[in-house]
Regions:
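A bilobed periplasmic-binding-protein/Venus flytrap-type ligand-binding module shared by bacterial periplasmic
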Residues: 111-122, 226-240
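A conserved helix-loop-strand patch within extracytoplasmic ligand-binding domains
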Residues: 104-153
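Short, low-complexity disordered leader/linker segments with a strong preference
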Residues: 1-33
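Ligand-binding "clamshell"
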Residues: 92-104, 118-119, 191, 196, ...
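Periplasmic-binding protein-like
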Residues: 140-148, 250-271
Length: 272
Protein backbone atom coordinates (compact mmCIF):
# COMPACT_ATOMS: atom_id res chain seq x y z
CA UNK A 1 0.00 0.00 0.00
CA UNK A 2 2.81 2.40 0.94
CA UNK A 3 4.61 1.52 -2.28
CA UNK A 4 1.48 2.32 -4.29
CA UNK A 5 1.10 5.66 -2.51
CA UNK A 6 4.72 6.55 -3.22
CA UNK A 7 4.29 5.73 -6.91
CA UNK A 8 1.15 7.87 -7.04
CA UNK A 9 2.98 10.73 -5.32
CA UNK A 10 5.82 10.50 -7.82
CA UNK A 11 3.36 10.66 -10.74
CA UNK A 12 1.83 13.82 -9.26
CA UNK A 13 5.25 15.41 -8.79
CA UNK A 14 6.31 14.49 -12.32
CA UNK A 15 3.09 15.99 -13.70
CA UNK A 16 3.76 19.19 -11.79
CA UNK A 17 7.30 19.40 -13.17
CA UNK A 18 6.00 18.83 -16.70
CA UNK A 19 3.35 21.53 -16.31
CA UNK A 20 5.95 23.99 -15.05
CA UNK A 21 8.11 23.19 -18.07
CA UNK A 22 5.27 23.93 -20.45
CA UNK A 23 4.56 27.20 -18.68
CA UNK A 24 8.19 28.28 -19.01
CA UNK A 25 8.08 27.40 -22.68
CA UNK A 26 4.91 29.42 -23.15
CA UNK A 27 6.56 32.43 -21.54
CA UNK A 28 9.57 32.06 -23.82
CA UNK A 29 12.27 31.91 -21.15
CA UNK A 30 14.99 29.54 -22.30
CA UNK A 31 12.83 27.93 -24.98
CA UNK A 32 14.05 26.71 -28.37
CA UNK A 33 11.72 26.85 -31.37
CA UNK A 34 12.58 25.14 -34.66
CA UNK A 35 11.29 26.63 -37.89
CA UNK A 36 11.55 24.94 -41.29
CA UNK A 37 12.65 27.03 -44.27
CA UNK A 38 13.61 26.31 -47.88
CA UNK A 39 16.68 27.74 -49.61
CA UNK A 40 18.65 30.80 -48.55
CA UNK A 41 16.53 32.33 -45.80
CA UNK A 42 19.15 33.00 -43.14
CA UNK A 43 19.52 36.76 -43.76
CA UNK A 44 15.78 37.26 -43.61
CA UNK A 45 15.59 35.65 -40.19
CA UNK A 46 18.76 37.12 -38.64
CA UNK A 47 17.08 40.24 -37.17
CA UNK A 48 14.23 38.07 -35.88
CA UNK A 49 16.62 35.69 -34.13
CA UNK A 50 18.55 38.59 -32.59
CA UNK A 51 15.41 40.22 -31.21
CA UNK A 52 14.03 36.97 -29.79
CA UNK A 53 17.36 36.04 -28.20
CA UNK A 54 17.01 39.10 -25.96
CA UNK A 55 13.87 37.48 -24.54
CA UNK A 56 15.39 34.05 -24.06
CA UNK A 57 13.83 32.53 -27.17
CA UNK A 58 16.25 30.56 -29.33
CA UNK A 59 14.92 30.40 -32.90
CA UNK A 60 16.61 27.59 -34.81
CA UNK A 61 16.31 27.40 -38.60
CA UNK A 62 15.96 23.95 -40.15
CA UNK A 63 16.73 24.15 -43.87
CA UNK A 64 14.98 21.86 -46.35
CA UNK A 65 15.96 21.39 -49.99
CA UNK A 66 12.46 20.71 -51.37
CA UNK A 67 8.91 21.93 -50.90
CA UNK A 68 7.29 18.60 -50.09
CA UNK A 69 9.03 17.91 -46.78
CA UNK A 70 8.49 20.95 -44.48
CA UNK A 71 4.73 20.46 -44.08
CA UNK A 72 5.13 16.75 -43.41
CA UNK A 73 7.82 17.56 -40.83
CA UNK A 74 5.56 20.13 -39.16
CA UNK A 75 2.55 17.82 -39.10
CA UNK A 76 4.74 15.04 -37.72
CA UNK A 77 6.09 17.17 -34.89
CA UNK A 78 9.67 17.17 -36.16
CA UNK A 79 9.70 20.98 -36.25
CA UNK A 80 7.60 23.59 -34.44
CA UNK A 81 6.90 25.99 -37.31
CA UNK A 82 7.64 26.46 -40.99
CA UNK A 83 7.89 29.48 -43.27
CA UNK A 84 8.34 28.69 -46.97
CA UNK A 85 4.95 28.68 -48.73
CA UNK A 86 1.97 30.82 -49.69
CA UNK A 87 -1.66 30.20 -48.80
CA UNK A 88 -2.52 28.56 -52.11
CA UNK A 89 0.20 25.95 -51.60
CA UNK A 90 -0.69 25.38 -47.94
CA UNK A 91 -4.36 24.87 -48.75
CA UNK A 92 -3.49 22.42 -51.52
CA UNK A 93 -1.21 20.46 -49.16
CA UNK A 94 -3.89 20.28 -46.47
CA UNK A 95 -6.44 19.13 -49.03
CA UNK A 96 -4.09 16.48 -50.42
CA UNK A 97 -2.60 15.13 -47.18
CA UNK A 98 -5.04 16.19 -44.43
CA UNK A 99 -2.24 17.88 -42.49
CA UNK A 100 -3.30 19.31 -39.12
CA UNK A 101 -1.48 22.62 -39.64
CA UNK A 102 -2.53 26.25 -40.07
CA UNK A 103 -1.21 29.74 -40.81
CA UNK A 104 -0.44 31.92 -37.79
CA UNK A 105 1.04 34.99 -39.49
CA UNK A 106 1.73 36.61 -42.88
CA UNK A 107 5.22 37.35 -44.19
CA UNK A 108 5.65 38.50 -47.81
CA UNK A 109 4.70 38.24 -51.45
CA UNK A 110 7.44 37.32 -53.93
CA UNK A 111 7.39 40.19 -56.39
CA UNK A 112 6.50 39.52 -60.03
CA UNK A 113 7.51 42.64 -61.94
CA UNK A 114 7.51 43.87 -65.54
CA UNK A 115 10.89 44.30 -67.26
CA UNK A 116 12.00 45.60 -70.65
CA UNK A 117 15.24 45.99 -72.60
CA UNK A 118 14.09 49.10 -74.46
CA UNK A 119 11.25 50.73 -72.52
CA UNK A 120 11.39 52.72 -69.30
CA UNK A 121 7.66 52.88 -68.58
CA UNK A 122 4.63 50.73 -69.39
CA UNK A 123 3.01 53.76 -71.05
CA UNK A 124 5.54 53.28 -73.89
CA UNK A 125 4.19 49.84 -74.87
CA UNK A 126 3.03 49.96 -78.50
CA UNK A 127 0.04 48.34 -80.18
CA UNK A 128 0.68 44.75 -81.21
CA UNK A 129 3.68 44.33 -78.89
CA UNK A 130 4.74 40.90 -77.68
CA UNK A 131 4.61 40.20 -73.95
CA UNK A 132 6.47 37.26 -72.41
CA UNK A 133 4.73 35.57 -69.47
CA UNK A 134 5.18 32.28 -67.59
CA UNK A 135 3.09 29.54 -69.16
CA UNK A 136 2.11 27.55 -66.06
CA UNK A 137 -1.34 28.21 -64.59
CA UNK A 138 -0.30 29.71 -61.25
CA UNK A 139 2.39 32.06 -62.55
CA UNK A 140 0.51 33.09 -65.68
CA UNK A 141 -2.47 34.03 -63.54
CA UNK A 142 -0.28 36.32 -61.46
CA UNK A 143 1.36 37.78 -64.58
CA UNK A 144 -2.06 38.67 -65.98
CA UNK A 145 -3.00 40.36 -62.70
CA UNK A 146 0.19 42.44 -62.92
CA UNK A 147 -0.53 43.40 -66.54
CA UNK A 148 -4.02 44.47 -65.51
CA UNK A 149 -2.65 46.54 -62.62
CA UNK A 150 -0.31 48.22 -65.12
CA UNK A 151 -3.34 49.26 -67.17
CA UNK A 152 -2.45 47.13 -70.21
CA UNK A 153 -5.36 44.67 -70.12
CA UNK A 154 -8.63 44.10 -68.25
CA UNK A 155 -9.70 40.76 -66.78
CA UNK A 156 -13.05 39.17 -66.03
CA UNK A 157 -13.70 39.88 -62.34
CA UNK A 158 -15.10 36.37 -61.91
CA UNK A 159 -11.61 34.95 -62.49
CA UNK A 160 -10.41 36.28 -59.13
CA UNK A 161 -6.69 35.86 -58.46
CA UNK A 162 -6.27 32.91 -60.85
CA UNK A 163 -7.17 34.21 -64.32
CA UNK A 164 -6.26 32.59 -67.63
CA UNK A 165 -5.64 34.20 -71.01
CA UNK A 166 -9.27 33.43 -71.89
CA UNK A 167 -10.34 35.75 -69.04
CA UNK A 168 -8.94 38.84 -70.80
CA UNK A 169 -12.01 40.98 -71.57
CA UNK A 170 -10.18 44.04 -72.89
CA UNK A 171 -6.85 44.22 -74.71
CA UNK A 172 -6.79 47.74 -76.20
CA UNK A 173 -3.22 47.48 -77.52
CA UNK A 174 -3.82 44.03 -79.01
CA UNK A 175 -0.85 42.66 -77.07
CA UNK A 176 0.37 39.20 -78.01
CA UNK A 177 1.14 36.90 -75.09
CA UNK A 178 4.18 34.67 -75.49
CA UNK A 179 3.90 31.83 -72.99
CA UNK A 180 7.08 30.03 -71.94
CA UNK A 181 8.43 28.20 -68.91
CA UNK A 182 8.85 30.64 -66.01
CA UNK A 183 12.60 30.00 -65.93
CA UNK A 184 12.94 31.08 -69.58
CA UNK A 185 10.96 34.34 -69.58
CA UNK A 186 14.09 36.48 -69.09
CA UNK A 187 15.74 34.87 -72.10
CA UNK A 188 13.02 36.41 -74.29
CA UNK A 189 13.66 40.01 -73.20
CA UNK A 190 15.62 40.84 -76.41
CA UNK A 191 12.70 39.62 -78.53
CA UNK A 192 9.67 41.10 -76.75
CA UNK A 193 8.55 44.55 -75.65
CA UNK A 194 8.04 43.55 -72.03
CA UNK A 195 8.23 40.46 -69.85
CA UNK A 196 6.60 39.58 -66.53
CA UNK A 197 9.25 37.79 -64.47
CA UNK A 198 9.28 35.98 -61.11
CA UNK A 199 11.71 37.63 -58.69
CA UNK A 200 13.93 34.56 -58.28
CA UNK A 201 14.48 34.27 -62.03
CA UNK A 202 15.04 38.02 -62.30
CA UNK A 203 17.83 37.76 -59.72
CA UNK A 204 19.28 34.68 -61.44
CA UNK A 205 19.55 36.73 -64.64
CA UNK A 206 21.26 39.70 -63.03
CA UNK A 207 18.19 41.92 -62.74
CA UNK A 208 17.46 44.04 -59.69
CA UNK A 209 13.70 43.77 -58.98
CA UNK A 210 13.67 47.07 -57.13
CA UNK A 211 15.61 49.10 -59.71
CA UNK A 212 15.43 47.42 -63.13
CA UNK A 213 11.69 46.80 -63.42
CA UNK A 214 9.44 49.28 -65.24
CA UNK A 215 6.36 48.26 -63.23
CA UNK A 216 6.36 46.69 -59.79
CA UNK A 217 4.07 44.14 -58.24
CA UNK A 218 2.00 45.12 -55.19
CA UNK A 219 0.16 43.30 -52.43
CA UNK A 220 -2.91 45.41 -53.30
CA UNK A 221 -3.19 43.82 -56.76
CA UNK A 222 -4.65 40.62 -55.34
CA UNK A 223 -8.12 40.16 -53.90
CA UNK A 224 -7.24 37.37 -51.47
CA UNK A 225 -4.19 35.87 -49.79
CA UNK A 226 -3.41 33.11 -52.28
CA UNK A 227 0.08 34.43 -53.03
CA UNK A 228 0.91 35.70 -49.54
CA UNK A 229 3.63 33.69 -47.82
CA UNK A 230 3.10 32.70 -44.22
CA UNK A 231 4.34 31.18 -40.99
CA UNK A 232 2.59 27.89 -40.21
CA UNK A 233 2.17 25.94 -36.98
CA UNK A 234 0.29 22.87 -35.81
CA UNK A 235 -3.49 23.25 -35.73
CA UNK A 236 -4.63 24.95 -32.54
CA UNK A 237 -1.23 26.58 -31.89
CA UNK A 238 -2.17 30.07 -33.07
CA UNK A 239 -2.50 31.29 -29.47
CA UNK A 240 0.87 29.93 -28.34
CA UNK A 241 2.49 33.01 -26.80
CA UNK A 242 6.00 32.16 -28.02
CA UNK A 243 4.78 31.60 -31.57
CA UNK A 244 2.82 34.86 -31.49
CA UNK A 245 5.97 36.64 -30.36
CA UNK A 246 7.92 35.12 -33.27
CA UNK A 247 5.33 36.46 -35.72
CA UNK A 248 5.55 39.89 -34.08
CA UNK A 249 9.36 39.85 -34.25
CA UNK A 250 9.18 39.03 -37.96
CA UNK A 251 6.66 41.71 -38.90
CA UNK A 252 9.04 44.62 -38.28
CA UNK A 253 10.89 47.41 -40.05
CA UNK A 254 14.15 45.47 -39.59
CA UNK A 255 12.88 42.63 -41.77
CA UNK A 256 11.50 45.07 -44.35
CA UNK A 257 14.99 46.56 -44.58
CA UNK A 258 16.43 43.10 -45.31
CA UNK A 259 13.85 42.68 -48.10
CA UNK A 260 15.03 45.96 -49.59
CA UNK A 261 18.79 45.66 -49.19
CA UNK A 262 19.73 41.97 -49.16
CA UNK A 263 16.99 40.77 -51.51
CA UNK A 264 16.83 43.88 -53.75
CA UNK A 265 13.10 44.38 -53.38
CA UNK A 266 12.25 40.80 -54.33
CA UNK A 267 9.89 40.47 -51.39
CA UNK A 268 6.99 42.75 -50.50
CA UNK A 269 5.81 42.86 -46.86
CA UNK A 270 2.31 41.42 -46.66
CA UNK A 271 1.41 42.14 -43.05
CA UNK A 272 0.53 45.83 -43.37
Amino acid sequence: MKKTALVFLWILLASGISACGKQASAEGSGSTVTIGVVGEAQEMWDPVKEELAKEGINLELVTFTDYSTPNAALAGGEIDLNAFQHYAYLNKEIESYSYEIEAIGDTFISAMNIYSRNLTDVSQVQRGSKVAVPGDASNEGRALKVLEAAGLIALDKKAGDSPEAADIVDNPLQLELVEVDAANVCALLPDVAIAVVNCNYALDNGLNPGKDSIFQDSVDIYEGKNYVNLIAAGKGEADNEVYKRIVEAYQTEAVKEVYKEAFKGSYLPAWE
